[in-house]
Structure formats: C-alpha cells, structure tokens
C-alpha cells in the first residue's frame, strides 16, 4: 500500500498534541465543548430572530390584506352618503298626494340638482358631446344622419354618458353625421 503524504493541519496537529498529553487533551476537549455551546447558543439566537422576523412579516401581510379589504368594502361609502338626500327627496315627492304639477316639477328639479351635486362630489362627469368629433371610446353611435357638419361629428345625444376620472362609466348614445 502506498503511504499518502499528509501535511499536518492545525486541527490535526492540535489533536495529535492533545493525544500526547492527557492534561492538554482534557483542556482541548473543554475548550471545544465551550466553543460548541457558544455556537449552539448563537444559532438558537439567530433562529429565534428568524422566527420573529417571519412572524412580523406575516403580521404585516395580514394587516395589509385587511386594510385593502376594508378600502374595497367602504370605498363607495362617501358616494352613497351623497345619494341619501336624493333618495329622501324622491320619497318626499312620492308621498305628496296633492297632484300639483308645478310643485312636482320644482321637486324634480331640486332632486336633479342634488344628484348633480352628488355626482360632482363623487367626481362623476357628464358626457354631452354635441358638436364634438365622434370618439368610439367615449361615445356609442346609434345611427348616422345626413348633416351639414363635418363627417363623424356628434349631431344629437340620445342618452348622456358619464365618466369618473378618465374611465367611462357609460358611453353617450349619439347620432353621428354621415359622410357626404
């Protein structure tokens, strides 16, 4: 058998030295035992820190989900609060049995103003595009009619559209001028 050429390393050298003298061996075992205990304590401390960080991350994630769920659930609350007076006015009009058309018209006008104010507070914008160029993203053409206006110009609005910010809630139903 060939004998391998081994260079003594500090660990193997220390082990060889410890094996030569019993007191030195006992000291080395004691030192290594203490070092193992210190490293185990440090590992336990790091594991505890890891568990705490993981738990904190999970708590943050759960709280964020709860906040998003609440925001979705109550996002319309402000707008709904603005619509309650409109409903009150409509119920009062229905409860009025006098049959006075002037009074009824006045009540409907008041209700329309209340609804317009609620829309304004909710940032809902009315789309009434008479005279504007037809935009398929904001308008829905119902028909084309001969007209003196430029082709593809909105001639008549059959039903107004509504937008919130830059998003179309409902496109305006329009009649568009036909090409000449």
From Swiss-Prot:
Molecular function GO terms recorded: adenyl-nucleotide exchange factor activity; protein homodimerization activity; protein-folding chaperone binding; unfolded protein binding
Classification via Gene3D superfamilies: 3.90.20.20, Head domain of nucleotide exchange factor GrpE
Record's protein name: Protein GrpE
Biased composition (Polar residues): 1-14
Lineage summary: Bacteria, Pseudomonadati, Pseudomonadota, Betaproteobacteria, Burkholderiales
Organism listed in the record: Cupriavidus metallidurans (strain ATCC 43123 / DSM 2839 / NBRC 102507 / CH34) (Ralstonia metallidurans)
Sequence similarity: Belongs to the GrpE family.
Keywords (A to Z) from UniProt: Chaperone, Cytoplasm, Stress response
Region (Disordered): 1-30
Functional summary from the UniProt entry: Participates actively in the response to hyperosmotic and heat shock by preventing the aggregation of stress-denatured proteins, in association with DnaK and GrpE. It is the nucleotide exchange factor for DnaK and may function as a thermosensor. Unfolded proteins bind initially to DnaJ; upon interaction with the DnaJ-bound protein, DnaK hydrolyzes its bound ATP, resulting in the formation of a stable complex. GrpE releases ADP from DnaK; ATP binding to DnaK triggers the release of the substrate protein, thus completing the reaction cycle.
Keyword Chaperone listed: yes
GO-annotated biological processes: protein folding
Cellular component per GO, a single term: cytosol
Quaternary structure annotation from Swiss-Prot or TrEMBL: Homodimer.
Cell location: Cytoplasm
InterPro entries linked: GrpE, GrpE_coiled_coil, GrpE_head
Principal localisation: cytoplasm
